[in-house]
Amino acid sequence: LNTAFTAGSSEGATILVVEAKHKLLSGGVQFNNTQSEELGRQLGILQTTINSPIGFGESLTMFGLARPTIKGMKGTGNDVSIRGGGLSFSYPLGDNGLKASLSYSESMTRPGGDIASLGIESNMKSGSLGLTYPLRLRADSTWSLRGTINWIDEIQQTNASGIDTDISHDRLTSLRLGLTYFGCPRGCIYFDTELSRGLDIASRSASEATTGTPLSRTSGTSHYHHLRLNSSYSFYALMDYLIKIGFGGQYTNDGLLNSEQSTIIGMDKISALTSGAISGDKIWYIRGELSRNFSIFKNLTISPYLYSAMGVAYTNKPTAAESKENAAKSAGLGVNINNFNDYFYFDKNITAKVEYSKTIATDKIEILSDVRLNKHHLMLFLNMSF
């Protein structure tokens, strides 16, 4: 993208000229070790987007995920602990920013390790249809509104007896309305809030489960409401130090099925525990981070950081086997590395993150679910986008 100014036709007028090159293909390759020990620790994700091949602003994105080993990508049976893939398509409706999107994905998890003998397997299919509209687009702030209809079908089964037997079966249809803001009036503010409601259409109710395969939670319902929020505020202190504070959560009075529960674990939440280690119907989390950028070469920067995070997840209407409340807090240090280059004749941005943390969690969850690399408490994240 290149810009320049040229003289206008009227006296004193100026015309902004923008020259851009169309990028037909874009995408990325990602690796991290945020999965549980039972799922093999490592996860690889490959994504490719075809940008406006016809010329109407449409895009088609395809992705796949698996454990990044030969057996993980090509194997079968117990060699495959996690695998998934999907595609999404978006198309602009008119010239006012309204955009329609359609997506579909499938995933499978087959935990190994100490519970491999149970033969547990989970298969999920999901799809969505949505509209997004920019309420306000300015150089210093953006507001966007979205509405989506989501559908999820998840079956958990076991073959411990030698025969595939369903343990639970959830099928949910949800209507979601979301609002997103990003702006930098003084510091930068981001928040995304979403209201969800369960619908009867194509959903599986508790009454259906009484005569067949049960739901994932006996107290869970497909008729629910919940409000979800993720936000952050970042600003510079003493000129060179960036402070970022993240806060969010989910609120509901209903007992939710597994797929609608939220988690306090994530890169911008508590990053020291494996994905999905702590989830609940109601949650809250807060994370603070202090970092500083150092430019090593022209296109290479490193950003050491310190962080502290905590969160709590609550279960509504818990059974005797469920925990009513789980909490965790962690503190650690890490470094982000960012490099842009055009080696091998294509532009790409390579980022990496290494993080060491100390975690304290309810019921010794940190012993079972902390992120590890080569038996050491280290989180590793690698990404190349092109």
Question: Each PLM stretch: what is its role?
Answer:
Residues L1-S101, L137:
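Outer-membrane beta-barrel initiation region
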Residues P92, K99-N258, Y314-N316:
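Transmembrane beta-strand segments of outer-membrane beta-barrel domains in Gram-negative
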